[in-house]
């Protein structure tokens, strides 16, 4: 496995870093890992390495580079405050420019998919609806304003039933507007996949990973080449 940092450029000329993890053998495809509000921190790099261990090239773009680089925050109140401030400064459209640029590079390894967590879970939704990339969204708490958008690519969603950030009426609206979308619920809180957070739930995380890799095995094999518009 090769783990390193690379520099990429978005369509508007913005340069940004990305953490890259490559498997020892020819990749099965590529997966873009989209951060939480805490930046491309140790956990997000670990996620990229887990994906690489399953045979995919993994790229984690540092989308916060647009609003001040080298952002790597802890899972505490101070980290949440700084992360939310960066999210407010950045918005979704600029982050999608960086993700699209990452996808254009990542497709050198084959079909491209996306996985995102929390804020990145909402970006994963937008990757499916706007970029046409197969996507896995973990507990995307900011997705509600975009529920009228129609996915252009396969989409899988994971939520914790004890997630205080995502109310039941969100789930009801999601089911009403997208009744055929595969959505899984777990007996866990927000951030249940992250073993550095208080809400980490090992059994739920393991089951979600199995479903996630089954999704990528199926849909990256079927995915068309990514076209950057």
Regions found by a protein language model. Give the residues of each.
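N-terminal cap/leader regions of alpha/beta-hydrolase-fold enzymes
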Residues: 1-229
